[in-house]
Amino acid sequence: FPLALASDFAIDTLCQQPAQWHVLDQASIAPLEFSVGDESAWPGELRRWRRMQSARIIWRDLHEHDDVEASLGAISEMADIALGESVRVLSELFSARYGQVKNANGEVQSFVGFGLGKLGGGELNFSSDVDLVYAYPQQGESDGVRSLDGEAYFTRMGQRLAQLMGDITSDGFSYRVDLRLRPYGNSGRLALSFAAMEHYFQTDGRDWERYAWVKA
């Protein structure tokens, strides 16, 4: 059995999720859907989903259904799906707790996560970090009873996103999130408005930082 010889990870995953063997034969990555209203279940659901979809990619590679480029693209797509669903449920959670952030004209402002590096280039492998930069369109405040200014709101959401993706649980972790490519690196603010980001790159950004955004 080629899979048993090639990947202990894949075999362990199939032993842990025996009802999911059919996933190996699926032509595309299965959607990720978190339990409604149960945030405590999200980390486990994300990690089990990632393990099973990773086993599927390994299976397809071993059986020569996909070449290296297709496999890297699938791994990157898997991360995109995980990030998209995570941002969706966290946006709903924060809206319920703090309301929605609106600018001076009453327009709703949304969380934006830019994928850089191998994620931005569609070249992730199974051991890659996920390089993210957090932003939001314009300054504002949330309209809930527990109001937050836009920067605090989206900073907290970004922190929760990194925890959901990267914290180690009994199911392992899903992705290591690297936020060091943001303006000013580790000393910089976690989430910036578009205007603040533009100002940084026009005044203080270094050439290599601008080049990194080619793959965003």
Where are the regions a protein language model picked out?
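A nucleotide- and high-energy phosphate-metabolite-utilizing enzyme signature
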Residues: F1-A216
